[in-house]
Amino acid sequence: PETRISDKLPLQLGNPELDKEERLRDLLVNTGLTEIVSYRWTTPERENRRLPKDSPQDDKPHLRIANPLAYEKGFLRHSVLASVLDTAERNARVRDRLALFEIGPQFFGSENPDGLPEELHRLAIVLSGPRSLPGWQPADAAAMDFFDLKGILTTLLDGLRLPEVRFDPGEHPSFHPGKCAKMTSGGKQIGVFGELHPLVRGQYDWPV
C-alpha cells in the first residue's frame, strides 16, 4: 500500500545565477567546445606565463594557502585563462586539435590585511590546431584562428540574447596587438578575445 505525504512540499527557490551559468555551458558545448575543470591552485610564476615578460604583472597579491600540499598548489589563481592554457599545453602532447573552455572563479587578495578576498567568475576559451579533425571525408586542415573564435562568441551571444552587442578593436597584454577585440553589450564591456601574443606563445610548449 502507498500513503501520500500529507504535508506540502517546500517551495523550491531557483538560483538565477546558476541557471545562467548552465545555459552558458550548454551553448558552448553546442558549438563543439569541451568543458574542463581545473585546479584553483597555482603559483604566481606559472600564471605569469600568460603575460609577456616585459609587461606589468598582476598588481594584486595572490591569496596564499596556509598549509598547501606543495608549493605548486600554494596559491589561488588570478586567471581562468592561465588554467586553460596550462591544460591545453599538456593535452597538446597527445592531441592535434583543442577546443576547450572553463567557467570558474578567480581570486584576488585585498591590499588591506583585514579586507576580504574577492572572487570573480570568468569564462576562458582556447582554440588550437586544425579547423576539422581528419576523417573519411576531406577535412579543412587550416588552423583555427581569430575568426573561428569570433564565430563561436557570436553564436554564444545570440543564444544569450544580450542587447546591443558590438565587437571593436581592443587591447590586452595576453593578446597580439592588432589581433584583439573587445565585446560590449549596452555600452558595457563584457569580454576580450584575440590571438595570443607571440611573446606569450613562446612561453608554452605547444603550437598555440
Language-model features and meaning:
Residues P1-V208:
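Extended beta-strand-rich architecture
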